[in-house]
Amino acid sequence: MQSIFDRVTVKNLFEVGAHLGHKTRFWNPKMVSYIYGTSNAKTHIVDLQKTVPMLRTALNAISDVAANSGRVLFVGTKMQACDIIKEEATRCGQYYVNLRWPSGMFTNWNTVSKSVKKLVHYEKLLEQEGDVLSKKERLSINRKRERIEKYLGGVRKMGGLPNIIFVIDPKKEHIAVEEAWKLGIPVVAVVDTNCDPSKITYAIPGNDDSLRCIEYYCSLVADAVLVGIESELQRKQSKELDDKADEKAAKVSHSDGQKKGASIRAGTDKAALQKRKVSPKSEKQDNVDAAKLPENKG
C-alpha cells in the first residue's frame, strides 16, 4: 500500500482540484469541519490536510476487503463518472453500477438476482435457439436482454451483496447509501461540501464533480483492490508452502517413529530369545537342588 499512499498527497490532490467545493449557498453544515475557508468566488475550499489521512484510511479499508475475498462495488451514475467507474471497476475485477441505481438493489437483492438469471437465460436462448426463433422473437428477446444488461451488467457476476461500496457523490447516490446503511454495508464516499457525511463509513472530503478528481479517486481505489488481491494470493501461497512443510515434517516424524518402534521390538525379541535359552537350564538346576535337600521326617 505504500506506493499508493505515496500518491495521496496534498500536492496531488491540489493539482487535480480536489480542494474546490461548491458555492457557499449550497453547503451542508455537517461538512463544516472539513472546510478550510472560502474563495473570492464564494466557493468553499476543502481542507486537504484532513483529506489525505481520511483517503488513506478508506483505501486501507477497501484493500482489506479485497484481501479477504470480499466484493467491492463501484457506484457513480453522474455523466462525468459513469465511464470511469466502469473502466476502473473492470480493471480490478470488481463490480459497478454506472447508469441508474436500481431501487431495492440491496434491500431486495432476490429480485435483482432473478433479473440476472433472466439475462443469462436470454443469452443462452439466443445462442442455442437463435436460428429457430423468428426475427420478431429474436428482436423481442434481445431488447429484454439489452435492457437488463444495461443496468445490471456490472453486477451480473457479483453473486451476492457487496462487502463494501465506493461512491462518487453520495448526495446523488443517496438511495444506494441509504440501502447500504440499513444493511450495515460499509460505505466509502467522496463527500463534497454540499454532502451529508453522517451515513458514510469512510468519508473522503473533496471535489466530486471534476473529471480529473474522479479519475484520481477511482484509480486509487482500483489499485487498492489489486494490492489486496495480491496480498491474498501471497498469503495463500505462503499457507500452501507451510502446509507442505508441516506435511513433510509429519511424514519424517512418522517414519522415525516406525524405525524406533521396529528397533525397540527387535531388542525386545532378542531379550526374550535369550531368556528362553537360559530358562531350561535354570529349571533343571532347581530340580537337582531340590533332590539334594534332606527329607523332613517330622
Swiss-Prot record:
One of its GO terms (molecular function) is structural constituent of ribosome. Residues 237-259, 280-298 have a biased composition (Basic and acidic residues). Keywords: Ribonucleoprotein, Ribosomal protein. One of its GO terms (biological process) is translation. Pfam families: Ribosomal_S2. Belongs to the universal ribosomal protein uS2 family. It comes from the Bacteria. Residues 237-298 are annotated as: Disordered. This is Small ribosomal subunit protein uS2. InterPro entries: Ribosomal_uS2, Ribosomal_uS2_bac/mit/plastid, Ribosomal_uS2_CS, Ribosomal_uS2_flav_dom_sf. The keyword Thylakoid does not apply. One of its GO terms (cellular component) is cytosolic small ribosomal subunit. It comes from Neorickettsia sennetsu (strain ATCC VR-367 / Miyayama).
